[in-house]
Amino acid sequence: MDERPETELISIPATPRVSTPEILTPSGQRSPRPATKPSSATWTPTSFISPRFLSPIGTPMKRVLVNMKGYLEEVGHLTKLNPQDAWLPITESRNGNAHYAAFHNLNAGVGFQALVLPVAFAFLGWSWGILSLTIAYCWQLYTLWILVQLHEAVPGKRYNRYVELAQAAFGERLGVWLALFPTVYLSAGTATALILIGGETMKLFFQIVCGPLCTSNPLTTVEWYLVFTSLCIVLSQLPNLNSIAGLSLIGAVTAITYSTMVWVLSVSQPRPATISYEPLSMPSTSGSLFAVLNALGIIAFAFRGHNLVLEIQSTMPSTFKHPAHVPMWRGAKISYFLIALCIFPISIGGFWAYGNLMPSGGMLAALYAFHIHDIPRGLLATAFLLVVFSCLSSFQIYSMPAFDSFEAGYTSRTNKPCSIWVRSGFRVFFGFVSFFIGVALPFLSSLAGLLGGLTLPVTFAYPCFMWVLIKKPAKYSFNWYFHWGLGWLGVAFSLAFSIGGIWSMVTNGLKLKFFKPPN
């Protein structure tokens, strides 16, 4: 068999040919005329590195490198994509933007927890209440920034879920143990609490609108829970996180509106005659200490949504030139500015209106107890209806991690995406399981202090630890000491607030009435 001839080295003319267009010559100059005397010999370059003047449009290798560089800058950091992510509701759609991020963060960050902040002020007073709320707000805003930055901290990897980031920082097994329970509660537990609050608020709305005309055969509380759950299941059929951006916008608008209405209506009415702004005192010093810890736990519980930050950011496209953390942080700044405009007026205005007479149920309970006959029924009914809309919208975003987990288990076993019927079945199942837990544990929404302590590390502690373990700042530097100290301070507060929440349950005589919701 004949041997293949060696590849010849083709010579490149030193100057462009006469027919070369002007646009192909350097700086668009006309091609120089050929020499009048014919060249006696043709010079062939013997080096693979051509002089710059020999290649007006660049060598083929240079063009390939330039094109490849541009492609990588547009596509990203050579991120290794998991094919399964294209089948899951959190990462199925990656066309999010800063507006979607603002909608989702507002929907997740403003909710029923803010309505009980004046209860904490009743135990802390003016100075300590405002100071504690301000410190907690700044602290959680910083840890939010940490999570946004850690989403793509390792080149070639996007941490699309909170548990994934915890596993990368703490290790596979320890990360699951530390992050799974609080994130599951903040997802499934919040969904259950939303069913309880949404159902009870629908019942109050019905009573206000109908008045004495509808007292013959009203629905029970459990039946209102079922009505609210059915509405949640219908809305949960939207396929992925980006598809509920419209619902998040509705939830954000309604949450801001009813938060403003609640404190404005409270401040505009005459204050109770026996109002006092002295912090509530307990018979013993230890009792007062635990009451303060429980109040701080209520403040910590008011800041929610950090378990969804990475999930929201994973819905955005990310490239080397346009990383996802830029629009995510832009949307987060807008949303948390609006969140501050909600929680601070509620806390200060609510405590000013009711003082230490604030009932444990929060602002809605205070409005209903003190001003049911003073405020026009239309305004009161509107406020309650907005709370229902906000709870319906919040249920969708807090349930999305649970939907994602169900579908991840299915797709990993079958190696195919969920069909419409399977996806709908998972969401119906989750909705009715949440309803069942709400009926079985009707006291769940009254454990704000305890639950705030148990879930506090997700917001205030773990992000600081993960920053040190992933970014690896210089040991014993200020950055190293600051994040370790802030993280361990969050863990200490978590233990203290949990103890305060348990003490509050014991002192107030919380009756664990299983399967006995209020009538």
UniProtKB/Swiss-Prot annotation:
It is a multi-pass membrane protein. GO terms for biological process: amino acid transport. GO terms for cellular component: plasma membrane. Residues 198-217, 265-282, 355-377, 449, 507-519 are extracellular. Residues 1-114, 157-176, 239-243, 304-333, 399-427, 471-485 are cytoplasmic. Keywords: Amino-acid transport, Cell membrane, Membrane, Transmembrane, Transmembrane helix, Transport. It is found in: Cell membrane. InterPro entries: AA_transpt_TM. Its main location: membrane. The keyword Magnesium does not apply. Amino acid transporter. Belongs to the amino acid/polyamine transporter 2 family. Amino acid/auxin permease (AAAP) (TC 2.A.18.2) subfamily. This is Lysine histidine transporter-like 8.
